[in-house]
């Protein structure tokens, strides 16, 4: 990535709109075909992931989320309320260039097409003592704006440290040792409303999730909600902040037209998750590998088990994305969407 000046000097091209020289060193989508064989190495991720979200694209298996804090063999499903479970037949280890799978069908079904979204945080991390609750582990990557936090809830107003050094704009919470709904904070909704990742519902008033207090550059406020701060229960929060040229959480208004709304991000997205916050609809997930060309970018739903869906959905552009459908989950006229 070099260029030459008028006097023939060779200089490195710096992309002014990005603070991360190589975004694929912090997030990458990996596709593979399962073989139902133990100790199958999935390589080419480009880094050792600290969070891996897997979905079997060919079947109606659950989504499976793994991270370095809970341990590689423990999975939890975004589409369900079931508790964190150990699945030794699924993901076996996080490796320097990817991960290893055993023979389980959700991640390695024979002949089945599977996707894994990979994020780099900071390994297992360590306890963060910035808040009134000392976290068990905070795995924070200040470069990519990704932090994974585990802590024990108190059931009363409290704070926890996220370690990012900048304000999180999107946070997914879960009481993971018991059956429970997922709770999602999004900056465009404010701290007194939330969404549920496992459900289709619109935004809802929720003053007890974050105690109606927006996150700061160091702390997340918690209220008494069992979804974010259940007394005596292990909790987890996956936190993301905006990073110029790499990640962004925002909102847009649908226009109900196949020549849909254009959403400016300032960079070409590699992963998009959308929710209609105005009314009931599925969540929607896209990436730059399934199919990887416009307009046929495949669709998955994090709130249900539906297999990969093909169709005319959206364009991934150099500076954002553009909707190409009038579906309620993406471009209903006048509806507000979070991404």
Features from the language model and the residues they span:
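Surface-exposed molecular-recognition determinants
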Residues: 2-4, 10-339
């Amino acid at each position: 990535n070099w260029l030459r000046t008028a006097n023939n000097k060779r200089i490195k091209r710096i992309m002014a709109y990005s603070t991360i020289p190589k975004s694929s060193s912090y997030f990458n989508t990996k596709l593979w075909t399962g073989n139902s064989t133990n100790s199958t190495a999935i390589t080419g991720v480009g880094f050792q992931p600290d969070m891996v979200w897997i979905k079997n694209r060919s079947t109606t298996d659950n989504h499976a989320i793994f991270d370095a804090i809970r341990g590689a063999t423990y999975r939890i499903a975004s589409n369900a309320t079931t508790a964190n479970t150990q699945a030794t037949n699924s993901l076996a280890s996080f490796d320097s260039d990817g991960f290893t799978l055993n023979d389980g069908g959700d991640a390695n079904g024979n002949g089945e097409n599977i996707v894994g979204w990979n994020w780099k945080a900071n390994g297992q991390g360590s306890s963060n003592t910035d808040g009134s609750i000392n976290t068990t582990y905070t795995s924070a990557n200040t470069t990519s704006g990704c932090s994974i936090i585990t802590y024990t809830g108190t059931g009363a107003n409290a704070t926890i440290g996220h370690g990012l050094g900048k304000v999180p704009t999107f946070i997914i919470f879960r009481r993971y040792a018991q059956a429970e709904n997922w709770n999602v904070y999004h900056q465009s909704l404010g701290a007194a409303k939330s969404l549920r990742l496992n459900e289709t519902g619109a935004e809802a008033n929720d003053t007890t999730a974050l105690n109606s207090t927006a996150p700061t550059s160091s702390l997340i406020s918690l209220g008494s909600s069992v979804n974010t701060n259940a007394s005596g229960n292990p909790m987890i929060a996956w936190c993301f902040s905006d990073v110029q040229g790499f990640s962004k959480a925002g909102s847009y208004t649908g226009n109900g037209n196949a020549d849909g709304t254009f959403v400016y991000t300032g960079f070409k997205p590699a992963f998009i998750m959308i929710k209609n916050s105005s009314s009931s609809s599925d969540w929607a997930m896209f990436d730059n590998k399934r199919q990887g060309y416009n307009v046929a970018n495949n669709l998955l739903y994090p709130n249900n088990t539906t297999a990969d869906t093909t169709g005319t959905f959206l364009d991934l552009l150099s500076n954002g994305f553009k909707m190409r459908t009038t579906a309620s989950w993406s471009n209903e006229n006048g509806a507000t969407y979070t991404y």
